[in-house]
Amino acid sequence: MTETAPVRRVAVALFEGFTVLDVYGPVQAFASSRIVGPDGKRQPLFEIFSMAGEAGRVKAGEGPASWAEWSFEKAPDYDILLIPGGFGTRAAVADQAFVERLATASRRARITTTVCTGSALLARTGLLDGRPATSNKIAWDWVVQQGPRVLWKRKARWVDDGDVLTSSGVSAGIDMALSLIARLHGRDMARTAARNMEYVWHEGADDDPFA
């Protein structure tokens, strides 16, 4: 059986010191979501690209570097924004110019997602004020200080607040991404993506063994 479905663009916001799995876990989940098109070929449901303050090399906290294809300002239109966490968030939250650019990037997206301490960055923009959110439990005390008006939820693998999804630490971003795939394309598609990754999906948003 062939299908047709819109291809959604995912923009990944990179910064110095991001956590590798925060980015590439969700990216793999999105990339593992495919359908068989009218031509009989497997077609992606998501188109993914990276961006940063400036296009070019961006070093992860764990060492390997990634390549930002676009600057925030020159990036093409996108539907979903992915904001990772990492030790680099400690410097990024103090960079007001970066925070403002991230706020603009979030407003461009239909859906903004954060992984781990990426929610601290979004909190600094003010766009999480009055909204439920979660984050990494090890860095919890620091994160909540970045957004005193945020309705922080400690026991949550991820929190879905419509156009904003936030996840707990590191690997939780994969579960969050799969939940978004389920919302957009059905639970069977999300389970297929998880199976393609040989990943055991925590399907419950409150299934948080680390809280």
Regions found by a protein language model. Name each.
Residues 1-112, 120-124, 141-146, 152-155, ...:
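Extended, subdomain-level signal for the structured scaffold at the beginning of enzyme domains
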Residues 127-145:
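Short, glycine-/small-residue-rich phosphate/pyrophosphate-handling segment
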Residues 7-9, 132, 163:
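Residues that mark the start of a beta-strand
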Residues 78, 109, 130-131, 161:
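Short, well-ordered alpha-helix to beta-strand connector turns
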Residues 134, 154-159:
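FMN-binding flavodoxin-like domain, especially the glycine-rich phosphate-binding loop
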Residues 163-169:
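A short glycine-threonine-serine/GTX helix/turn-capping micro-motif
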Residues 172:
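Divalent-metal (often Zn2+) His-rich catalytic cores of metallo-beta-lactamase-fold enzymes
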